[in-house]
């Protein structure tokens, strides 16, 4: 067999091996991102499950605060219907804002703050918010690793051809970045 042909075949086999290895690496990173996203969804669902109990507890003391309760319900519905990372991120920001307003309403009712059920729900909500923050961080780290990988040589040459594209970060909406005004 021709020596040049052997060199070409060997080079093609090496290139094929590198592409397959890179492909498998991208598949693994993509699945890692999907797993991290599932963890965010699990924590968001946990928070969603806590909210009705919290709202009902506050309603018992502050029934006339219907606009706050409606904002929480609307934000929960929007989060439940989110289909993309951007929609979920936006809805999560709205729900966090509505929950903050709900907890501010609770501050006006000393009997409510002394209610053991309310205190327990508030603690569970705080713990869940912390788990959501950690899950977001893990997700965004996985997305950053994946996005960096598909932009690096030689992966950039074949990632798009094999169906891999940049993934979206779970970003905080602009409304959540605003510093709340506190008046004494």
Model-derived features with residue positions:
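A helix-centric hydrophobic-segment signal that preferentially recognizes long
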Residues: 1-184
